[in-house]
Amino acid sequence: MGKNEKTSLGRALVKHHNHMIQETKEKGKSYKDQHKKVLESVTEVSDIDAIIEQAEEAERLFAIHHDSATPVPINMDTGSSSSGITAKEWKEQRMREEALHASSLQVPRRPHWTPKMNVEKLDANEKQAFLTWRRKLASLEENEKLVLTPFEKNLDIWRQLWRVLERSDLIVMVVDARDPLFYRCPDLEAYAQEIDEHKKTMLLVNKADLLPSYVREKWAEYFSRNNILFVFWSAKAATATLEGKPLKEQWRAPDTTQKTDNPAVKVYGRDDLLDRLKLEALEIVKMRKSRGVSATSTESHCEQVVVGFVGYPNVGKSSTINALVGQKRTGVTSTPGKTKHFQTLIISEDLMLCDCPGLVFPSFSSSRYEMVASGVLPIDRMTEHLEAIKVVAELVPRHAIEDVYNISLPKPKSYEPQSRPPLASELLRTYCLSRGYVASSGLPDETRAARQILKDYIEGKLPHFAMPPEITRDDENETADDTLGAETREGSQTEKKGEEAPSLGLDQVLDDLSSFDLANGLVSSKTKQHKKSHRKQ
């Protein structure tokens, strides 16, 4: 009897032990499956993907006839309108609407949380807050006068940003020096102040070696007037100096023609930037302690100051981190979104760097192709290469394209404005002809040429830059002329002379008109045959 009771007790213990092991395996498997999915940036989703994602985030099934199942109509043609207004009037209306709804473009906020909150509750609150934020942006997309650029739609990516902002004393927003305001997110600075009023945000103006010194002076004046903390920096130049290798790219050579004594225009080196970051972060910590504010739970366990790096993809965050660390610690590539998780890197006993994945913040823009040309969206996923090349052709001077690629672009016709930029088709076909890019169909491989031109544009091989908003278009053209040199000025004078009404003969005018008709398919086949026979006679 006792033996049987002992046996049954042992079996019960073994059964309970096996049951606990099975539960542990199932929990581990579910955790592994949950984190097995690679963290990937998502900027565009289809209608069905959006419906499924909303259903998962809301943790309930959507009815078939739910309102959100109806695709939101988005008018991507910003130059047209059903009311028949001109393109200029449409642009003015769009700018007024953007100014009216500028405050609606916010970074998603992390809901309030406490260390005592369990994982399920925290996850549900974050999903609900993110879903509410997505719905607010969807309501903006319903406005036909607004064009919302693609933005990050993966909650896990935004979670990385939340962690970095909470851990960091100083937030460094890395921007491209050629157009700093395009990459700057003012609401991110406001969000950092909401988390902790003592946090500061610094603009790290990367790729500053691509700007002439007078352009850096203009931007330095603009940043100072608007109380923006900034530093000019070049990750590529710092890496080359660290490795003891000269810059191979001649277009990235330091600007020695125009020197200035303004210290604000100086392009910082590695040691100077580390000292500046440490100084700014220590001031924040001292100010926080002097006012009796306790440190957050993440930073109270150590005396290190934390500097977090945030910004758009492909602006040079990972390159900057590698240059500051002194060795390759984060992946660097021309494709946006290489960094998947935030990383903490210890520089010294009192300084820690925190790298955040690149985020595409929501913004208003006239075209998504500007984001492709800027490198924010991947070039390899580009579908309309002509529109993206059009952006490059309009921003880079004609002579600069010809000098860089050693090509000769077709000149404008006599009936066209002589100062017009080259067409995208002209640039692509000329480039394909000079490089021998031919597709399998026998036609010029314009897609391959477009990808190469866009990569050169992003890398800085094709020179371009934007001026501060206070600079008028005429002033920008005048300052740009100063950097082009004597050859450029001679070329521009030739173009200005060409703008005057030339004395054309009747035969030349007829030839131009016939070529225009042929290009637009306005000439019938009979006319072509008659013209050929007339020439033979």
Swiss-Prot record:
Ranges for region G5: 234-236
Keyword check for Nucleotide-binding: yes
Region described as Disordered: spans on this chain: 484-508
Domain (CP-type G) ranges: 158-362
InterPro entries recorded: G_CP_dom, GNL1-like, GTP-bd, GTP-bd_ortho_bundle_sf, P-loop_NTPase
Subcellular location: Cytoplasm
Keyword Isomerase applies: no
UniProt motif (DARXP motif) ranges: 176-180
Entry-linked PROSITE patterns: G_CP
Start and end residues of each stretch annotated as G2: 337-341
Major location category of this protein: cytoplasm
Amino acid composition bias (Basic and acidic residues), ranges on this chain: 487-500
Gene Ontology molecular function, alphabetical: GTP binding; GTPase activity
Stretches for region G4: 206-209
Region feature (G1): 311-318
Region spans: G3: 355-358
Anything else known: Although LSG1-1 does not show a nuclear localization, is not associated with ribosomes and the lsg1-1 mutant does not show any rRNA processing alterations, it might be redundant with LSG1-2 since it can partially complement a yeast lsg1 depletion strain, it binds to rRNA and a lsg1-1 and lsg1-2 double mutant is lethal.
Entry protein name: GTPase LSG1-1
Native source species: Arabidopsis thaliana
